[in-house]
């Protein structure tokens, strides 16, 4: 590492099994179109900027679409880091730790979930259908929401808890 390879020199050996070993060699008249960055040995310290750098690289002989995709990948990474830095700054000014999803941890305890838009909720969109076909469902659902599972008998509470666990495990966006 840190020196140039000569033509025909064995660069690296890879053990495939106990009986065979592949040797990686630099072939004659091999032109390296790209200059690959190689980290210097450990006695040279890293720059501090390298610890905070995300590098998206491609080669000049890649198709245009692949080069364009790497540009958009870099833009996406930079926007994510900018968003994360803004969250850290806001949390620092409010003297609170950010939660996993980016919202303060106390919002769930207050029953406030900013990721849920209350204005376009479809939870009661089927009330007319249930009133027409299943007349007993809407009052039972209202009673169930009001009682908050306290008045359910044990087996129904176990089923509801099991359904909630299944929903939590299957839904990755919660």
From Swiss-Prot:
Membership in a protein family: Belongs to the ATPase alpha/beta chains family.
Protein name: V-type proton ATPase catalytic subunit A
A single GO BP: ATP metabolic process
Annotated keywords: ATP-binding, Cytoplasm, Cytoplasmic vesicle, Hydrogen ion transport, Ion transport, Lysosome, Membrane, Nucleotide-binding, Translocase, Transport
Swiss-Prot/TrEMBL catalytic activity: ATP + H2O + 4 H(+)(in) = ADP + phosphate + 5 H(+)(out)
Membrane topology recorded in Swiss-Prot or TrEMBL: Peripheral membrane protein
Gene that encodes the chain: ATP6V1A
Native organism: Mesocricetus auratus
Domain of life according to the entry: Eukaryota
């Amino acid at each position: 590492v840190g020196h140039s390879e000569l033509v025909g020199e064995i660069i690296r050996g890879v053990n495939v099994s106990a009986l065979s070993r592949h040797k990686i060699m630099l072939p004659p008249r091999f032109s390296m179109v790209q200059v690959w960055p190689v980290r210097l040995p450990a006695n040279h310290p890293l720059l501090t900027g390298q610890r905070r750098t995300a590098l998206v690289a491609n080669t000049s002989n890649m198709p245009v679409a692949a080069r364009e995709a790497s540009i958009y990948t870099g833009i996406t990474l930079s926007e994510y880091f900018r968003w994360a830095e803004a969250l850290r700054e806001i949390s620092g000014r409010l003297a609170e730790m950010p939660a996993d999803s980016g919202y303060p941890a106390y919002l769930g305890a207050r029953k406030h979930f900013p990721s849920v838009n209350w204005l376009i909720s479809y939870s009661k969109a089927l009330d007319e259908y249930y009133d027409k076909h299943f007349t007993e469902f809407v009052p039972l659902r209202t009673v169930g929401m009001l009682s908050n599972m306290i008045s359910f008998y044990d087996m129904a509470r176990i089923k509801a808890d099991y359904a909630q666990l299944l929903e939590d495990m299957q839904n990755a966006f919660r």
